[in-house]
Amino acid sequence: MCSSDLTAQQLAEHFAARGVAVNYPGLASSPYHEVAKKQFGNRYGAMLTLRLGTKGKAFDFINHLHYALNVSNIGDARTLVLHPATTIFVHASEEEKAAAGVTDDLVRINVGLEDPEDLLEDFQQALQQI
């Protein structure tokens, strides 16, 4: 696995162990795990999503991060976070958002190449603030 894949796996496991709802195909608990394992081997990618309970908590979490950038693109060497409901799905209807699994408490994380321990610490401190 490349660095961002490994870090995404670590973050997903870290959040899941703390009771946060995580969508990441590398987790054995994911409904997509077996399909992803067959299709991708042990490379589950560098993107995961979290559900934090409310829109306010999602915003607070994002605003307390120091390393991750709050931007709506992917494909950067840096870790990026965004709130899909108010960025890339801002013009979608409620039905379209629901069909795509986009909720007000959803946060998308695209893991970059930063030190995994730095990211884990940063995400943990942000989680503790909400």
Regions found by a protein language model. Name each.
Residues 5-72, 76, 93-98:
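Conserved small-domain helix->loop->beta segment predominantly found in fold-type I
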Residues 63, 79-130:
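PLP-dependent enzyme catalytic core of the Aspartate aminotransferase-like
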Residues 1-3:
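Short, small-residue-biased leader/transition segments that mark boundaries at the very start
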